């Protein structure tokens, strides 16, 4: 839980919590758009657990044997929207705008197919860090071994699998700023594209959000509205060619908890070893500044070892590991990691 020194009442009463399953079907999954007016597919209470199934990109249409040309056609079939298949939304009783939703990622179980692709740079010259240098596009498929948690890239190269959700979104921010680049954020129906990360989470691509981690998101709409998708089984920081090792999940089990006592603007996360602070902007330098400011805010506000804002800035410079989450989602992402081990006062 987030430190009691920062927010009180961090052990909510979860007596009576229930467990649910939300399968991914055409009725429970949307392709590339978030819509706060979408009818909830499940209604839960704070502290309940949900096992969510997810699909591969483009409503499970990218599977072994599908060519890069066919992937291009699928991409063009949903202009402005993301390629992501997102399961939801899930309505959380009691969640109100201004609250924080604390989302525990309890378990991730993969399906067996995965892929990575980059779109043809000659057709999509700005999609992917080096798109113009790779004009033809490329797709590669993988079989994922859940027992060994590995996959073979090619003979002689075996990859360890580290699954995490690339997209975990709450209902969109009604005041999200207008796009500075790329296709419009909103379509004619008022839906929000899953392409860009923002304060409500969405396409964050932070590879630390693995099993056992906890994500904290600002609630913008009544009921919070949780969507899950863009399932990843491995990703390097940067996600440079456009995609990770994209996959889908038999289930990702989450436990959302409504926090009335914690108020944040930007996404935060924690693992057993680190606190994590995020920033997103079309300008990578601005994304870095946002993430660093959020780190400083946390350190200056925490009461475990009180410090000035100047001391927090200094400490951030010495211990925060600020990583480029992704550079391919129009809004670029940075996440700064502060090790918990530096706080030795009991």
Give the positions of each predicted feature.
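Short, structured beta-strand/loop micro-motifs enriched in basic residues and often containing a Trp
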Residues: 24-35, 79-87, 192-200
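Short, Lys/Arg- and Gly-enriched loop/turn segments at beta-strand edges
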Residues: 57-69, 108-119, 223-233, 326-328
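N-terminal, Lys/Arg-enriched amphipathic/low-complexity engagement segments
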Residues: 12-78
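Intrinsically disordered, low-complexity linker/loop segments enriched in Gly/Pro
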Residues: 107-209
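Conserved mixed alpha/beta catalytic, RNA-binding, or beta-rich assembly cores of soluble enzyme
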Residues: 161-167, 172-174, 178-284, 296
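Short, well-ordered loop/turn sites that connect or cap secondary structure elements
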Residues: 44, 92-95, 209
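A generic structural signal for residues embedded in beta-strands
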Residues: 52, 100-103, 217
């Amino acid at each position: 839980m987030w430190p009691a020194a920062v927010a009180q009442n961090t052990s909510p009463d979860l007596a009576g919590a229930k467990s649910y399953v939300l399968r991914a079907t055409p009725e429970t999954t949307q392709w590339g758009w978030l819509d706060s007016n979408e009818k909830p597919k499940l209604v839960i209470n704070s502290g309940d657990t949900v096992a969510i199934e997810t699909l591969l990109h483009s409503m499970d249409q990218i599977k072994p044997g599908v060519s890069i040309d066919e992937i291009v056609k699928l991409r063009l079939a949903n202009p402005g929207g993301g390629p992501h298949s997102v399961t939801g939304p899930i309505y959380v009783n009691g969640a109100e705008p201004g609250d924080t939703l604390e989302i525990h990622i309890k378990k991730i179980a993969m399906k067996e197919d995965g892929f990575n692709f980059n779109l043809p740079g000659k057709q999509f010259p700005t999609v992917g860090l080096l798109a113009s240098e790779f004009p033809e596009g490329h797709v590669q498929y993988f079989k994922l071994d859940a027992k060994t948690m590995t996959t073979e890239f090619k003979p002689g190269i075996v990859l360890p699998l580290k699954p995490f959700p690339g997209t975990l979104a709450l209902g969109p921010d009604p005041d999200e700023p207008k796009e500075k680049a790329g296709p419009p954020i909103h379509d004619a129906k008022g839906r929000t594209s899953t392409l860009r990360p923002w304060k409500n989470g969405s396409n964050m691509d932070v590879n630390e959000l693995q099993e056992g981690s906890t994500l904290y998101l600002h609630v913008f709409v009544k009921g919070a509205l949780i969507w899950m998708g863009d399932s990843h089984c491995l990703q390097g920081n940067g996600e440079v060619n456009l995609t990770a090792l994209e996959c889908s999940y038999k289930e990702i089990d989450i436990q959302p908890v409504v926090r009335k006592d914690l108020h944040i603007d930007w996404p935060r996360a924690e693992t057993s070893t680190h606190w994590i602070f995020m920033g997103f902007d079309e300008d990578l330098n601005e994304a870095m500044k946002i993430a660093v400011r959020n780190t400083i805010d946390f350190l200056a506000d925490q009461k475990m070892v009180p410090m000035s804002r100047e001391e927090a800035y200094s400490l951030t410079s010495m211990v925060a590991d600020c990583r480029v989450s992704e550079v391919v989602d129009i809004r670029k992402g940075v996440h700064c990691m502060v090790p918990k081990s530096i706080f030795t006062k009991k």
